[in-house]
Amino acid sequence: MFLLKIKKERMKRMDFSLTREQEMLKKLARQFAEIELEPVAEEIDREHVFPAENFKKMAEIGLTGIGIPKEFGGSGGGTLEKVIAVSEFGKKCMASASILSIHLIAPQAIYKYGTKEQKETYLPRLTKGGELGAFALTEPNAGSDAGAVKTTAILDSQTNEYVLNGTKCFISGGGRAGVLVIFALTEPKKGLKGMSAIIVEKGTPGFSIGKVESKMGIAGSETAELIFEDCRVPAANLLGKEGKGFKIAMEALDGARIGVGAQAIGIAEGAIDLSVKYVHERIQFGKPIANLQGIQWYIADMATKTAAARALVEFAAYLEDAGKPFTKESAMCKLNASENARFVTNLALQIHGGYGYMKDYPLERMYRDAKITEIYEGTSEIHKVVIAREVMKR
């Protein structure tokens, strides 16, 4: 009986099935992706158009408030719910998956570190209000090296305002966001220990949008340069405490990497779906190419690696939701899922042959879109450093 009890408890802990609410969310996100995103995905990519109307619709059905309690306009849930929604979007429109995933960073940071007043002011706007959120850390000389940030936010004690000066680059949604979490040096001489997080609203005097980038992929996810020239924001907009900005940024990035993992498994699963359909329809030498062993091996490799990637992403999500350390697992899941997305979209394009190379078919777009998952929220190389450090800790 003792052994049987242990076995039952272990089986209970190893239950990977979704709850009823999570299944409903998955169905909702899948239907939204099929009805609202898939029909416009090619246009979004071709015209480099930010899907503003679709983002408003995401807010209307509660997807922009995932991870935020209902009292602040959110939908509740946690990281696994984010993975469910983002991966469904990734199957049909990677740009939209990226927009949702990156948007969620700002409200979750404000919910975790914000004051009561900040939560009441900004969270309803970022959830049910339909305003886009942005997270601005990267600078021209501060990519993987966050310690090289030069943007300053000096407190003017007479007006009780922070005065921001500096430039941020490659900020996803930066040109469209209504509420942004900016990382700047409040005490420049202290370096990383002098970095703080500050909430800045669109339209604040001294804050302007610079270059909007033309990218290889995820064209609908607008990426912009942010310029701060004597931009004054109330001291009350400080998120958390002074000098804690680097900690806030790194913790936010741990969660964001799971979001990128979700994007990557979504696009991989979408590429597999297209490939399976194609190999049954494509006739060569008098029979479907699905009968060819080489094609079967491709499909087997794609499906196996993607299933493993999903398992690692969902495990990292479980750890974050459970309040357990997850830095190593978030880096692992992002590294693995992103490299798998490139692998799968490459094989899927190969399976489609000449058709896959043409812009009339979605595979060439998916192939381009997949690459960014190996770069943003930390490159694959940086993640290997993070993983090695975590594994070798004593």
Curated annotation (Swiss-Prot):
Q: Which GO terms describe its cellular component?
A: cytoplasm
**Active site located where?**
377
The EC number(s) this enzyme carries: 1.3.1.95
Q: Which residues bind FAD?
A: 135-144, 170-172, 282, 293, 350-354, 379-381
Sorted alphabetically, which InterPro entries does this protein's record hold? AcrC (IPR050042), Acyl-CoA_DH_CS (IPR006089), Acyl-CoA_Oxase/DH_mid-dom (IPR006091), Acyl-CoA_Oxase/DH_mid-dom_sf (IPR046373), AcylCo_DH-like_C (IPR036250), AcylCo_DH/oxidase_C (IPR009075), AcylCoA_DH/ox_N (IPR013786), AcylCoA_DH/ox_N_sf (IPR037069)
Main localization (coarse): cytoplasm
Q: Which cofactor does it need?
A: FAD
Family matches, as Pfam families: Acyl-CoA_dh_1, Acyl-CoA_dh_M, Acyl-CoA_dh_N
Q: Which PROSITE patterns match?
A: ACYL_COA_DH_1, ACYL_COA_DH_2
- UniProt entry keywords in alphabetical sequence: Cytoplasm, FAD, Flavoprotein, NAD, Oxidoreductase
As given in the record, the signal peptide range reads none
Task: Please describe how the activity of this protein depends on temperature.
Answer: In the range between 25 and 55 degrees Celsius, the activity increases with rising temperature. Above 55 degrees Celsius, it decreases and becomes almost zero at 65 degrees Celsius.
Q: Which GO MF terms are attached to this record? A: acryloyl-CoA reductase (NADH) activity; acyl-CoA dehydrogenase activity; FAD binding; oxidoreductase activity, acting on the CH-CH group of donors, NAD or NADP as acceptor
Q: How does it assemble?
A: Heterohexadecamer; tetramer of tetramers. Each tetramer is composed of 2 alpha (AcrC), a beta (AcrA) and a gamma (AcrB) subunit.
Family to which this protein belongs: Belongs to the acyl-CoA dehydrogenase family.
**Record's protein name:** Acryloyl-CoA reductase (NADH)
Q: Which organism is it from?
A: Anaerotignum propionicum (Clostridium propionicum)
